[in-house]
Amino acid sequence: MDNRWPPYPALSAKHVEGARLFANRRDQIIGLGLPAGGKVAEIGVWRAAFSKVLVEALKPRQFLAFDIFTGHLETDWNGQTGHELFDGLMHRQFYEREMAPWRDIVTIVEGSSLETLKSHTDRSFDLVYIDGNHAYDFVRSDAAIATQMVKDSGVLVFNDYMLIDHNHANYGIVPVVNDMVVNQGWRVVGYALDHGLYCDIALQRADAVQRPRAAPTLLGRLRAALGG
């Protein structure tokens, strides 16, 4: 095992039984079939692009946006400065501007998720979207607290299910997710492709997942047809 990550298990067929494949992460959010009027959180909101998808697709009654909001301080984010990325505004100001149409349902929670998430562990969320700091220790912490945030039937979606990004940064999402699925009672319910392979993976507690019914056998169909 590569020492850049802790040892972690591989998934097997039983862990993805019934999971759906989606062309992109927006399709996955829609395809999860969550009811409108729920409660949704996004950990790491950046420039609000996916926040808009979440509120438009899920129509929640409450949306909590967690971030440290320091993006305006970036000196080189893939060739752009924070000043350029956020139109000369502070990160939080930019986000507030972008989310203004939904201000009635949006609650902004500023600060490190290591601390801010702890006040929301009441199992009231229908979905928590995790896209914060991708270093292993941060992902593990966000995931552990997020499991206490979602309802028993709630869904966790992790962005960037990959080990290394195109800038050669090491990500901790795969080890954390795989351990949750193999050792902590979660199952994969969806996987969303991305054109750059920054894919999303959706998890739900195994005891909340409806397993697909087995296809009836020929003998079973004959018995049903004959009333037996």
Predicted regions and their residues:
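S-adenosylmethionine/decaboxylated-SAM
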Residues: 2-19, 27-228
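N-terminal pre-P-loop "Q-motif" helix
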Residues: 24
